[in-house]
Amino acid sequence: MGNYHPHGNASIYNTLVRMAQPWSLRYPLVNGQGNFGSPGNNPPAAMRYCCTGDALVRLPFGHSVRIGNFVPAACPNSDNAVNLKVLDRHGDPVVADQLFHSGEHQTYTVRTAEGYEVTGTSNHPLLCLVDVGGVPTLLWKLIEEIRPDDHVVLQRTPPVEFGPADWHDVMEALLLGAFISEGFVSEVRAGFNNCDRDYFAMVVGAYDAVVGGRRYVSSRRIASGSTLHELDIQNIKELKEARLGDLCGQRPADKSVPDWLWHSPAAVKRVFLQALFEGGGSCSALPRNMIQISYSTRSRQLAVDVQQMLLEFGIITRRYRHAVGEHKVLITNRAQAELFATRVGFGGAKQEKLTKILGSMPPCAGMDSDHVPGLARFIRKHCGSRWVDKDWLNRHNVDRIQRWRTSGEKILSHIADPDVRAIATDLTDGRFYYAKVASVTEAGVQPVYSLRVDTDEHAFLTNGFVSHNTEAR
């Protein structure tokens, strides 16, 4: 409608809202969807523009699509009918029936302390954990209302089903992970090397099955005493014709996860991550029974993509830039390392090393940064329990997600108030990670998009953040 008004959408939004309110008009003129306020003067939802086109929307079976690619030919300020299933705030599939291209607007990037990011307009709502009178509560906040040290909600429920995986796609994912981490593809030549003989043989076999053509393999002893196995491809004609051809001439700092892999099911993404970490990742035991799993790259975008893909498997990581210029994706606590080992893992000998490190560590006591902010204080104040139970609650960490996984029933046995029990159970069931906001910065004027989701909660996932859909464009 803004195309027909000299001052755009904003000038007519309030009128459109009133036209959809049955208490404002005897005969409503607009069939509204979403929050249009109430007769008690509760305000309607703000007009929303949503996220930039690079935001990844999660679909069932581990598929992901950038919101700007749902309807590639969508015109600015247009409504586009779609019929697809996306994941809601709980990780369940729901129907999205409209894609809105809302034109170009000023945008802002919300970045968490771990490095997770989403970019949207100032009036786009994200689900946050807010202290409401001492009660930790899940509420929507507009990006313009979010401040550093607030806590945003990240959805981390892993796919229940990994979806059908075509063998050809699996082999291509394996090759992509291997060549991104320890290979190169120039305009005239390509190569790959690794010290793990079995892993190297697997990569060569995948290359023969997917790409084919003449190639050479060799082995040599290097300074460390290990044997380095090398794959040399001197004619890359066949490689250019495959989807790996996108790597031709790509600088290390420009590497990223291609769209075809984002569109693939979780089973294919898992193989890619296994190959990537086997080539460029590492794991090591640290003092004081700590562990570290890391992946290093010169490409910022690749680090962002790897962190985001691990989040799709429910694995929380930290991303930062090292002093030497490399971007690192890091796991530093036992609970997340165990999830990595079971849900993704390395693709070769490093997996055995990781298993041994985890096996040598004492049982995880749940003391890590994965917690529900404000929950311990709320439970201790409002538990309604006897003094002996209150004393137990004061002496134990009752806000850690891992502790609730291992000792949830024991914690609940010390809480008498049923409402407190219900709130604590809902916040600690593991669906969400409560990430502290590090910054909210301007990101310039960009095209923005939104979906209309046919549920009561009107929520979908963008880069793991829980976003509210648009009521009106």
Swiss-Prot record:
It is found in: Cytoplasm. Gene3D superfamilies: Hedgehog/Intein (Hint) domain (2.170.16.10), Homing endonucleases (3.10.28.10), Topoisomerase II, domain 5 (3.90.199.10). Residues 175-315 form the DOD-type homing endonuclease domain. Its EC number is 5.6.2.2. GO terms for molecular function: ATP binding; DNA binding; DNA negative supercoiling activity; endonuclease activity. The active site is at Y49 (o-(5'-phospho-dna)-tyrosine intermediate). One of its GO terms (biological process) is intron homing. This protein undergoes a protein self splicing that involves a post-translational excision of the intervening region (intein) followed by peptide ligation. SUPFAM superfamilies: Hedgehog/intein (Hint) domain, Homing endonucleases, Type II DNA topoisomerase. Keywords: ATP-binding, Autocatalytic cleavage, Cytoplasm, DNA-binding, Endonuclease, Hydrolase, Intron homing, Isomerase, Nuclease, Nucleotide-binding, Protein splicing, Topoisomerase. It catalyses: ATP-dependent breakage, passage and rejoining of double-stranded DNA. GO terms for cellular component: cytoplasm; DNA topoisomerase type II (double strand cut, ATP-hydrolyzing) complex. Pfam families: DNA_topoisoIV (PF00521), Intein_splicing (PF14890), LAGLIDADG_3 (PF14528). Transmembrane segments: none annotated. PROSITE patterns: INTEIN_C_TER (PS50818), INTEIN_ENDONUCLEASE (PS50819), INTEIN_N_TER (PS50817), TOPO_IIA (PS52040). It is an enzyme of class 5 (isomerase). Residues 1-473 form the Topo IIA-type catalytic domain. A type II topoisomerase that negatively supercoils closed circular double-stranded (ds) DNA in an ATP-dependent manner to modulate DNA topology and maintain chromosomes in an underwound state. Negative supercoiling favors strand separation, and DNA replication, transcription, recombination and repair, all of which involve strand separation. Also able to catalyze the interconversion of other topological isomers of dsDNA rings, including catenanes and knotted rings. Type II topoisomerases break and join 2 DNA strands simultaneously in an ATP-dependent manner. Few gyrases are as efficient as E.coli at forming negative supercoils. Not all organisms have 2 type II topoisomerases; in organisms with a single type II topoisomerase this enzyme also has to decatenate newly replicated chromosomes. Heterotetramer, composed of two GyrA and two GyrB chains. In the heterotetramer, GyrA contains the active site tyrosine that forms a transient covalent intermediate with DNA, while GyrB binds cofactors and catalyzes ATP hydrolysis. Belongs to the type II topoisomerase GyrA/ParC subunit family. This is DNA gyrase subunit A. It comes from Mycobacterium malmoense. The gene is gyrA.
